[in-house]
Amino acid sequence: PVYLLTGVVFFNFFTEATGMGMTAITSNAALIKKVYMPKYIYPISRLCSSLINLGMALLPLFIVMMFTGTAFGPSLLLLIFDILCMLGFVMGMMLLLSTAMTFFQDTQFLWSVVSMMWMYLTPVFYSDSIIPQNLLVYYHMNPMYQYITFARICIIDGISPEPIAYLWCILSSVIVLMLGIFVFKKGQDKFVMYL
């Protein structure tokens, strides 16, 4: 149960945050046209809301850990690192999606399909032990696989992940966040024309 719930909690945070962040600009069109404030405030506010929901979702996970006898060790503190990296990655995705949504209204429908496929390509409901060895390298390129696996190692195994896991988490977070900031900055001055 802990293995499954960990995957569900973390992936739900990803889908909820990106879904809310995608409409951060378009749903605030009237306000953006009337009042000037930095436009990145809108996606950030959505991220904060999703982060609160993540915190609330972690409580049932910890309760299940207690009932299943999963040890509460120092490795749980490493979840802070994992969540911080995931926040950077998710923020980058939100900036990319909110920009795309402003210019292309169909982004919302495309993303619903992409996010569902992404979920099936991430070991949320199944163990990564069933993944063929020749395909495992492609799974390692999936940031959500990295974040969820990192969390599972900390929670279930009660140990620190390998150093390469830290590197993967940081790289995917920084790269996607920087890309999101770049694209958002390039497009934000044109938002008003498309709202």
Model-predicted regions and their roles:
Residues 1-67, 109, 113, 119:
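Hydrophobic alpha-helical transmembrane segments of multi-pass membrane transport proteins
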